[in-house]
Amino acid sequence: MLSTTAYKDKFSGYTYFTPGSGYSVMKQFYNREPRFYLGITFQNRRWDFDNSRTYYTVMSFNGNSGPTGNTHDYPIFGTIGRKPLSEGTTPSGVDNAVIIRLGEVYLNYAEACCELGDLATAIHYVNLIRSRAGVAEYVGLNSEDQTARDARGETRIDLGNLTQDLVRKVIYRERIIELAFENKYYFDVRRWGVADMAQGDGWIYPSWHKGGEGGQMVGFNVSNLGTTEEQKNVQMNFYKRVQTQTRVFTKRMSFLPIPQEEVNRDLEIVQNTGWETDTDEE
C-alpha cells in the first residue's frame, strides 16, 4: 500500500493520502490514466468539500460507505461512479445535467467514419479525445499522423495495419472509457450486438469474462468474506477479488418484446427475435 508518500490525482492535483491521516491507497489505484480518477471513487479516496472539510470514502465491511455504515445503500462491487459530481458538491449542491457533449460527438463521428471505411479519419477523432484526456494517441500504418510522438510528447500506441475490425474495437473501447457513467454503455453494447458475447475479447469485456452482460460479476470483498483470520484485517481483506453476482443475459434481452396484442392486430409485424410465440408462427 502507498503508506509513506502523498498520492496525487493526476487530473485534479489533489492529494489523496496525507501522512498521519490513517488512510492509504492500494498501488492498483495509483498512476492510472486521468479518466479513471475523474470517473471512479475507490477505497479510501479523498474528497475535499468547499476547502473546509475532507472526507474519505471507506467501502470495506465496517467503513463509512460499507455494509455496516450503510446497510441498504452501499456499492456492492467496492467502487462507485463519481463523474457527475464536482469536488465541491454537498448534499444540498446543484449541478447541471449534460445532455450531449463534444466527446460524444467526436466518438459518434469516428464510429460513422469507421463503418464507411474511412479508418484514418476515425482514428484522428479518437486521438482528439485521447489528447484532451491526457493519454497517448494511436498511430497506424495508414493513419493521418505518422510521427512517433503526439503533440504532448507521449509515445504513440502503434496499432499496425488499420483494419475496420481493429478500428471498430478501438472506438468501442474508447466509448466505454470516455463515456463511462453517462448512460451510454447500456445502449451501446446492445446496439453493437455484443451484449451476449460468449467469451470476452479484451476490448469490450475482459478476456477472462464469459457471458457478456451476464455471467460472473466480480468485485472487491465488501462483505469481508473469508477465514476467521482473514476477517480480522477488514481493510486488507477488502482487496480480495470475489464473485459478487451471477447474472443471466440471453440474446433476446437486447430488445424488449413488442406487446403481443399489437402483433395479433397486424400480421405484418414481426416479433423481436427470441420473443416469438406459437401464435406468431401459425
Task: Give residue spans per PLM region.
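Acidic/polar-rich alpha-helix caps and helix-coil junctions
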Residues: 1-282
